[in-house]
Amino acid sequence: IAAEGATVTIEEVNYDECVRMAAAEADACERGVIVQDTAWEGYEKIPSWIMEGYGTMASEAAEQLREMAINRPTHVFVQAGVGSLAGAVVGYFTNLYPDNPPTFVVVECAPAACLYKGAAAGDGDPRIVDGDMPSIMAGLCCGEPNILGWDILRNHATAFVSCPDWVTARG
C-alpha cells in the first residue's frame, strides 16, 4: 500500500477504532473512499460487494466438493472477525441448500467474540466488544459486527464458538 503512495501508520487502538479513523480520513478527503468489509448504518454498499466476493469463494468450494462427489456438506465451520466472510459463506450455502442447509458453526476469537455474545443474548441484537483484544488471532480481533453479516448469521448459523488462543495454537 505504501508503494502505491498511501500513508501507512501503526496505531495503538483496536481494529474498530482504526476503521473509524480511516473512515474519518476518507470523509475529510475530497475524493476519499473507504474500502473495507465492516458495514454499519449508511455504509453498506462496498461491504456488500466484498461479501459477494467472499460468496464467490464459497461457490468455488461448493464446486470442489461436487468434483469430489460430495453433494452437500453436513457441517460448515467458518471463522469470523466482523462476520462478513462468515455471513457470505452461510448465506451462500443456505441459498444453495434451502430445504436442508448444513449445520453452520461460526468460530470467533474469544477476546472479540461479538457475534457469539449477540447470539448468546438471544434477542437478535448485535453486541459490541471494545477495548484491548489480545490474541494470536489478530486478524479476527474485531469487536463490532458487520450489520449485513450479522443479519444472515443470527438467522441461519447453528452455533457460535468463542475460541481461546490455545485452540488456535494447536491448529
Walk through the language-model features, giving the residues of each.
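Structural detector of well-ordered beta-strand residues that form the stable sheet scaffold
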Residues: 9, 34-35, 77, 105
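Active-site-adjacent helical/loop segments in soluble small-molecule enzymes
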Residues: 29, 145-171
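A glycine-rich helix N-cap at a beta->alpha junction
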Residues: 1-25
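Conserved acidic residues
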Residues: 32-33, 74, 158
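Generic beta-sheet signal
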Residues: 11, 37, 107-109, 163
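Glycine-rich phosphate/pyrophosphate-binding loop at beta-loop-alpha junctions
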Residues: 21, 41-155
